[in-house]
Amino acid sequence: MSSLAEGIGDPQVRNRGTIGGSIANNDPSADYPAACIALNATINTNNNRKINAENFFRGMFETCLKKGELIESIDFEIPQKSDYQKLKNPASRYAVVGVYVANHKSGTIVGVTGAKSCVYNEKSLSDKLSKNFSSNSIDSTEISPSEMNSDIHASAEYRANMVKALAIKAVDAC
């Protein structure tokens, strides 16, 4: 998490922003949401709700928070190994694509940001890495570009390829 935080956007956001603010905003290219997915986070609110990260993020800039509801704390599972890799936009340092791989005792979760309109668990990679935590196990995996973002920074096909490439890099870094 500390190395992820070092690579966040600009100095103002890095030094004054909060993880709670980042996940409540749910910017599709923010870094912390990928960590929340991969680390199987539980988001605790002032209404005493405990929300699993996979249920918290709903869509672009959308979460399941209700009007007036605030994030009070976030609990993370501690993985056996983890790493975050991202392709940075050269101007903003936001993730064009970011991949957080976390290997837990119960299996592996691959959280992806920047690739689609909302952070998500790339289950095809998570399932294969849960069976065999090795970059070789995902080397032949094809990621579909069908729901990927496509803009001036990267095409949908490029983003799909980067999800796999960054996952391989993250696994190798573990």
State where each predicted segment sits.
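C-terminal structural segment of proteins
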Residues: M1-C174
